[in-house]
Curated annotation (Swiss-Prot):
Gene3D superfamilies referenced in this protein's UniProt entry, alphabetically: Aconitase, domain 3 (3.30.499.10)
Family: Belongs to the aconitase/IPM isomerase family. LeuC type 2 subfamily.
Free-text comment on the cofactor: Binds 1 [4Fe-4S] cluster per subunit.
Pathway listed: Amino-acid biosynthesis; L-leucine biosynthesis; L-leucine from 3-methyl-2-oxobutanoate: step 2/4
Record-given protein name: 3-isopropylmalate dehydratase large subunit
Quaternary context: Heterodimer of LeuC and LeuD.
Cofactor entry: [4Fe-4S] cluster
């Protein structure tokens, strides 16, 4: 009987099986940021265990509230900063070099097919786009990961999501994943790996695959995952060229990390996206979705473009194509947060930042701040935001605020009209 990619990764990293169905895995990468990691650091220090298993396998960044907005967030940042220096963690990204973790770390080439990756952040599943098993974990597991380089997981069960057909104009990866979550629900993949397959995934860029995998957690998934292919190799090639003689050699090595044809899945779900419309959320859960045609005209106060879901260069290009030569509505605040310094610089070189600013957008430094209602775009009570982020929980971007999740294209069209709008009319 064949194995899924998740089963192969588990088998290759297995250290112990203390209980039936519980696997202790060796970790390839432990990621850390300044919101959750200081809690783990403080507990390890209190127990006299202030050490790390391997400083080369720990990647740390200050990204959630940066630069710090007050003494509390400054203290959190300092704690992570001091810890990284104390333990010789070279891959630490401080103010000026920092970006949103789930965009920055792939950009740095830290992820490979077949890797095991953890972080005290629920959207760690993003990195499954590279054919890795990547999962968000709690403080206790993070402490063990930092200290021992291992983490315990349940035996993986996989739901195969076949995405077939071809994407219509104006429809993107964000629309696809919102559609999938709308179909299966916020608990539809609880404790499962969501394996994304099909012709649509095959033709997606790595940026789009990261958008898909990023929101696996919004359906309850432990991780999202895609099969590594030449798209993966091309993205990683600047970091692989000293390890492999050719791209073809790298692809051959990565082909080990693909699900077998006779692998057994808990479920197989088929989606034909050929007639899919742009999708927008309407409530306080990511599975409350509607086609844009059914919600168009809803007024908004703010449009936010950024985050680990849709703050990459591809996303900025899509939105800028719609915004070029236009102005946002006078009733709307437009905020753009490129996800990393490199994305920001590349967008400047391409003239994208000029397009956003001429349209009336405020452009901030790379940060997660607005997404979780902490800085750089917090909503007032009763305000409504059209956002390219990944969560629309009540008060997520500010107490009493409402969030409509959508693609960068839909957010750009919405900014122009001051109300939720169909981007296809601008393409």
């Amino acid at each position: 009987m064949g194995k899924t990619i998740a089963e192969k990764i588990f088998a290759s990293h297995l250290v112990d099986e203390p209980f039936a169905g519980t696997k202790v895995l060796r970790l390839d990468v432990v990621m850390c940021h300044e919101i959750t990691t200081p809690i783990a650091i403080a507990d390890l220090m209190a127990r006299g265990k202030d050490r790390v298993f391997d400083p080369t396998k720990i990647k740390a960044v200050i990204d959630h509230v940066t630069p710090s907005k007050d003494s509390k967030t400054a203290t959190q940042a300092k704690m992570l900063r001091d810890w990284a220096r104390r333990h010789g963690i070279v891959d630490f990204f401080d103010v000026g070099a920092n970006g949103v973790c789930h965009a920055l770390f792939p950009e740095k080439g830290f992820i490979r097919p077949g890797y095991t990756v953890i972080m005290g952040d629920s959207h760690t599943c993003t990195h499954g786009a590279f054919g890795a098993f990547a999962a968000g974990i709690g403080t206790t597991d993070l402490e063990v990961g930092i200290l021992k380089g291992v983490c315990a997981f349940r035996e993986p069960k996989t739901i195969r999501i076949n995405l077939n057909g071809s994407l219509p104009e104006g429809v993107y990866a964000k629309d696809v994943i919102l559609h999938v979550i709308g179909r299966i629900g916020v608990n539809g993949a609880t404790d499962r790996v969501m394996e994304f397959r099909g012709s649509v995934v095959d033709t997606m860029t790595m940026e789009s695959r990261m958008t898909l995998c990023n929101m696996a957690i919004e359906a309850g998934g432990t991780s999202g995952i895609c099969m590594p292919d030449m798209v993966t190799v091309d993205y990683l090639w600047p970091f692989l060229k000293d390890e492999y003689q050719s791209r073809e050699a790298a692809l051959a090595a990565f082909s080990l990390w693909r699900s077998d044809e006779d692998a057994v899945y808990e479920q197989v779900l088929d989606f034909d996206v050929s007639s899919l419309e742009p999708i927008v959320t309407f409530g306080y859960k990511p599975d409350q979705v509607k086609p844009v045609s059914e919600i168009a005209g809803t007024p908004v106060d703010q449009v936010y473009l950024g985050s680990c879901t849709n703050g990459r260069l591809e996303d900025l290009r899509i939105a800028a194509r719609i915004l070029k030569g236009k102005k946002i509505a006078p009733t709307v605040r437009g905020i753009l947060s490129p996800a990393t310094p490199k994305i920001y610089q590349d967008a400047m070189r391409e003239g994208l930042i000029d397009i956003f600013m001429e349209a009336g957008f405020c452009v901030t430094n790379p940060t997660c701040g607005a997404c979780l209602g902490m800085s750089n775009g917090v909503l007032a009570e009763g305000e409504v935001c059209a956002s390219t982020t990944n969560r629309n929980f009540m008060g997520r971007m500010g107490k009493g605020g409402m969030v409509h999740l959508m693609s960068p294209a839909t957010s750009a069209a919405t900014a122009i009209e001051g109300k939720i709008a169909d981007p296809r009319k601008y393409l």
